[in-house]
Amino acid sequence: MFDIGASELLVLVIVAIVVIGPKDLPLALRTAGRWVAKMRRVSNHFRAGIETMIREAEMEEMERKWKEQNERIMRETAAQETAAAQGQTPAAAEDQNDPFPTPLAADAPHTDPVMTGPMPPEAKVEARVEEAPAARPGSQQP
């Protein structure tokens, strides 16, 4: 970062020993280390803020491009639908744009008719005949 070579660092150490003295040198180095750490934290925080702003600007640009592309696609699709609808009858074009189409009888599920009233007398007789087991000749029924 500061591009300090080995010889320059040696000169700084000798000057620090002479000026500060060997007794107070550890305290001075600790204080200098704290200041360097604070400067690094501030610069990292500043860098992170700048990078966040850049990312947000890029996201806004991408969202703007996506919105423009979406609008272009919607216009092209609408133009194709109107071109296709011109060859249809007005009723068919209206049915195409109906958001809730009327269901057709063919779309309904198939069910058998259900009788809701009392059974006719001939149906009762047939039901009894089907329920009764077939009697075998020579065997008794309980």
Curated annotation (Swiss-Prot):
Q: What residues form the membrane-spanning segments?
A: 1-21
> Which parts form a coiled-coil structure per UniProt?
none
Q: Which organism is it from?
A: Novosphingobium aromaticivorans (strain ATCC 700278 / DSM 12444 / CCUG 56034 / CIP 105152 / NBRC 16084 / F199)
Q: Which GO terms describe its cellular component?
A: TAT protein transport complex
How is the quaternary structure described?
The Tat system comprises two distinct complexes: a TatABC complex, containing multiple copies of TatA, TatB and TatC subunits, and a separate TatA complex, containing only TatA subunits. Substrates initially bind to the TatABC complex, which probably triggers association of the separate TatA complex to form the active translocon.
Q: Where in the cell is it found?
A: Cell inner membrane
Q: Which UniProt keywords apply?
A: Cell inner membrane, Cell membrane, Membrane, Protein transport, Translocation, Transmembrane, Transmembrane helix, Transport
What is the documented function of this protein?
A: Part of the twin-arginine translocation (Tat) system that transports large folded proteins containing a characteristic twin-arginine motif in their signal peptide across membranes. Together with TatC, TatB is part of a receptor directly interacting with Tat signal peptides. TatB may form an oligomeric binding site that transiently accommodates folded Tat precursor proteins before their translocation.
Name the protein family.
Belongs to the TatB family.
Renumbered to this chain, the Basic and acidic residues biased-composition regions fall at 123-133
| GO MF terms, alphabetically ordered | protein transmembrane transporter activity
Chief subcellular location equals membrane
Q: How does it sit in the membrane?
A: Single-pass membrane protein
Name the domain of life: Bacteria
Q: Annotated region Disordered: where?
A: 75-142
Q: Where is the composition biased (Low complexity)?
A: 76-94
Q: Name one GO biological process term.
A: protein transport by the Tat complex
Tell me the gene name. Answer: tatB
Q: What is this protein called?
A: Sec-independent protein translocase protein TatB
